[in-house]
From Swiss-Prot:
Family, per entry: Belongs to the succinate/malate CoA ligase beta subunit family.
Binding site for ATP: 46, 53-55, 102, 107
Superkingdom classification of source: Bacteria
Subunit structure: Heterotetramer of two alpha and two beta subunits.
Cofactor binding mode and count: Binds 1 Mg(2+) ion per subunit.
Protein name: Succinate--CoA ligase [ADP-forming] subunit beta
One of the GO BP terms on file: tricarboxylic acid cycle
Keywords per UniProt: ATP-binding, Ligase, Magnesium, Metal-binding, Nucleotide-binding, Tricarboxylic acid cycle
EC number: 6.2.1.5
Names of the cofactor(s): Mg(2+)
Amino acid sequence: MHLHEYQAKDLLVSYDIAIPPYRVASSVEEGQQALKELAIDAGVVKVQVHAGGRGKNGGVVVAKSPSDILAAVDKLLRMRFVSNQTSGEALPVEKVLITPLVNIAAEYYLAVIMDRKNRCPAIMLSKAGGVDIEEVAQKYPDQLLTVPLTPFARLYNYQIRQIIKFMNWEGDIRKQGAQLIKKLVQCFYDNDASLLEINPLVLTQEGDLLVLDAKITIDDNALYRHPKLEVLYDPSQENVRDVLAKQIGLSYIALDGNIGCLVNGAGLAMSTLDILKIHGGSAANFLDVGGSATEQQVQEAVSLVLSDENVEVLFINIFGGIMDCSAVASGLVAVMQTRENLIPTVVRLEGTNVDLGKDIVQRSGIPCQFTDSLNEAAQLAVALSKQG
């Protein structure tokens, strides 16, 4: 679960991490109140969306007067934000963050991440902050330092010394940096985060280390341990189908292909996506209905997949171990019989009550093609998806 910048900063403030004062506004009137509370004549106004690239895509405005700040608040709250991280979708802007300008002497990048290569949490740092870290990693890998962490939220003194030396922090900045890193690591572990990114972390001309921007992602599977974080979930920032899938308890991820997939089991679902790609096709979604879905849940899953206007072919791939193939068939038929414009459907059923399931579909008269081979089913689905 992604947090908005202001939510991430609220969390960091609770760990006594130094952040310039900020206020959040959802209207021009709230912007006026924010100006009074901050007592500033110039500042930065930033859209609050779950996407990066705000600065490059008009989502961040540097304002040099109170009237400019309010004009920026009004403008940004009216926009729908699009960047290369929104998958072509325009995200609504319901809040903006207002914060003072800072006298910056140096910018850094600092993050606590899940290092999948080494299978452990890690601190990642760079002396080049305020830029795309992916670009730095690709062009200047020597400017990045990755420090692995233990599973027990412990940061050793030698690791802190290694970081401080790499960042060239001296004097009082050494102490500030050491304390900041310890607090960020603690925050990461305490809240079951999968990402805690500070970009940029700045050194001011006054000699202070300040967090200017923060991005935090919480592990969805751990939210039951964090009810105060769970209520921060913002469904307006997600694909409508993703939100619906969560409400009905399905594991769904929207993709950009045209073959809608309904599969049981995450492993089989990923294999289905792979084999479609091998044969030149592209899935419109990942959808795992689970191992014991009911007829009602299958109906909801089919309706969810077909609600995507990009879906031109429906591919159902079920291995009925615990799952009843007849329930899958009944759920599919129930949805298809309510639709006027039916799309080609490829079905592969194996396992419990497979013959009954096939019979239910065949007697319904819906346009459906069966095959027992996963390879043949994928080839057929891809061929149908390219008929236009």
